[in-house]
Amino acid sequence: MRTYENIMIVHPDKVADEYNAVVEKFKGVLTDLNANLLKVDEWGVRKLAYPVKKQGRGSYVLTVFEADPTIIDEYERRLRLDEAVIKFQTVLLEKGFVEEAAAAAEEGANAEEEE
């Protein structure tokens, strides 16, 4: 299994219930495809660098997961078909990246506690 990071931008006009339904739907898709969810981080609504599908803002969702490389095409196909998702990108993380990031975050938290 490899570690992947996916960022998706959800249409900004979706109300909270619809937005949560989209996020839960794609968590379920990953689970159905036998992926292990490591992290789901909702960044909220942010301004886009350039308009995408005539939208200047979007709700960002970052997902980190472990999966077989064979499921990525199916996952991205489902993202492409959902009208609520206006843009997405999935990247393969280097081996050990998740552990290094967790260690760095822990060191940062310890430094803040000492101050």
Curated annotation (Swiss-Prot):
GO terms for cellular component: cytosolic small ribosomal subunit. One of its GO terms (molecular function) is small ribosomal subunit rRNA binding. Gene3D superfamilies: 3.30.70.60. It comes from the Bacteria. GO terms for biological process: translation. Keywords: Ribonucleoprotein, Ribosomal protein, RNA-binding, rRNA-binding. Belongs to the bacterial ribosomal protein bS6 family. Binds together with bS18 to 16S ribosomal RNA. This is Small ribosomal subunit protein bS6. It comes from Syntrophotalea carbinolica (strain DSM 2380 / NBRC 103641 / GraBd1) (Pelobacter carbinolicus). The lineage of its organism: Bacteria, Pseudomonadati, Thermodesulfobacteriota, Desulfuromonadia, Desulfuromonadales.
